[in-house]
Amino acid sequence: MQEMSRRNQHFTDSVIRRMTRISNECGAINLAQGFPDFDPPKEMMDRLEVVSHEGPHQYPITMGAPNFRQAIARKCGHFMGRTIDPETEIVATIGSTEAMVDTLFALTNPGDRVVMLSPFFENYRAQVIMADCEPVFVPLNPPTFSFDPNALEDAFRGGAKAIIICNPSNPSGKVFTEEELKTIADLCIRYDVYAIMDEVYEHIIYDGRKHVYMNSIPGMWERTVSCSSLSKTYSVTGWRLGYAIAPENIMARIRQYHDFNAVGCPSPLMEAAVVGLNMPLSYYDEFGAHYAHMKKIFTEGMRDIGIPFTDPEGTYFVLADISPYLKKGQSDVDFCEQLARKAGVGAVPGSSFFNEPINNIVRLHFAKKDETLYAALDRLNHIKDMM
């Protein structure tokens, strides 16, 4: 038989989803894959129940149902501080993941260099490789996960076509400051580089910090694609509804790839999601307070147990240092498998997020009910005995 594609020789299956499968097999509390165990807003579920009987149930307009795009334009226009045209500057996608893939194909050609900040969400490397591009890594330096502007400029100077930035950052929990984003923006403009922003955690930010949208920085609207989803903000990770926002000339290209990749998003889910997108602004305050509450429970519990970790500025992830618990020669992948099977807690090995050789970090998440978090902390409290 003829040879199959060589592209996926350079990446494996998702470590995050693999850890979910292991957690499910052994009944572990899944703090690996980032999804909540509480319901979406009742208003959205009530609307979905009505839509299940009344429709729509057939193909939508490829770019997304008009009322869905209009609701995105209103909501995002408010937070981004600009008018967004739902007819020419938005496309609905199968989660932010599809938005990122479509964007890479729309902006790059085979062999182009794409800058990524390490640590990074594991999907990015695979997506860049699938687009036949070359990933170029610039480290974020713990514990603040700041970057060296000179190192970033060196990466740009080498001929970068685009940079991928997750803000707030999965897995580090970093929230990029306006000054940091302006530094990146200056380099993007100077070296003619596109900014591909993954902003799915835009409303999960702590301690009075502010999410700054890259496309709001002067000179960046023309070269920025903002990818996001409803998954985190409305606790509907299984609905797989996302979107991209970009200027018309870029959006026209993204829509072409979306059309042939996905045809469209689920019609009944878009209809029900409009209710969420039209929530009053108070919803986002309450949403943020809920996540601050969950963060407090989990981080205080981790401190009491004595497990070192990074305190996130945003997102619902912590990076924990497992150095005290690693056996000699043990990999972080094996540690996480044993943690799920013996301690009953699912985690993600940090090596799947870093380009640098990291073996002592795992990612945990706290988007869970109070009782789930307390149960997980109780199990982690016995980690020394179980491991």
Where are these regions (language model features)?
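Active-site phosphate-binding strand-loop segment of PLP-dependent enzymes
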Residues: 140-207
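PLP-dependent aminotransferase class I/II
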Residues: 223-314
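Conserved PLP-binding catalytic core of the aspartate aminotransferase-like
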Residues: 291-292, 305-342
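PLP-dependent enzyme catalytic core of the Aspartate aminotransferase-like
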Residues: 74, 115, 154, 328-330, ...
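Helix C-cap/helix->beta junction micro-motif
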Residues: 26, 131, 190-191, 305, ...
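N-terminal small-domain helix-loop-helix segment of the aminotransferase-like
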Residues: 2-95, 102, 278-279, 386-387
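A short helix->loop->beta-strand "cap" motif at the edges of active sites that frequently abuts
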Residues: 112, 133, 190-194, 221-222
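PLP-dependent aminotransferase-like
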Residues: 86, 105-165, 178
